[in-house]
């Protein structure tokens, strides 16, 4: 069985230590809730815009909205 001895040098930083030290303060706020509505209104605006985007895509897919100059028949797709 192949085994490998790892250096146990306490002064040597592991590869992800820099990222860990940057992200640790963000995790310190875990579970705390800011008073008030915060960014809920902004989230609602983005959800509404995304819903409008989905409706537009659905209408284009169902050919409810026809674009001028864009062929919508399968015959134009075939070579």
Swiss-Prot record:
Its main location: plastid. GO terms for biological process: photosynthesis; protein stabilization. The keyword RNA-binding does not apply. The modification Phosphothreonine is found at residues 3, 5. One of its GO terms (cellular component) is photosystem II. Pfam families: PsbH. InterPro entries: PSII_PsbH, PSII_PsbH_sf. It is a single-pass membrane protein. It is found in: Plastid, Chloroplast thylakoid membrane. Keywords: Chloroplast, Membrane, Phosphoprotein, Photosynthesis, Photosystem II, Plastid, Thylakoid, Transmembrane, Transmembrane helix. The chain crosses the membrane at residues 41-61. GO terms for molecular function: phosphate ion binding. Belongs to the PsbH family. PSII is composed of 1 copy each of membrane proteins PsbA, PsbB, PsbC, PsbD, PsbE, PsbF, PsbH, PsbI, PsbJ, PsbK, PsbL, PsbM, PsbT, PsbX, PsbY, PsbZ, Psb30/Ycf12, at least 3 peripheral proteins of the oxygen-evolving complex and a large number of cofactors. It forms dimeric complexes. One of the components of the core complex of photosystem II (PSII), required for its stability and/or assembly. PSII is a light-driven water:plastoquinone oxidoreductase that uses light energy to abstract electrons from H(2)O, generating O(2) and a proton gradient subsequently used for ATP formation. It consists of a core antenna complex that captures photons, and an electron transfer chain that converts photonic excitation into a charge separation. This is Photosystem II reaction center protein H. It comes from Klebsormidium bilatum.
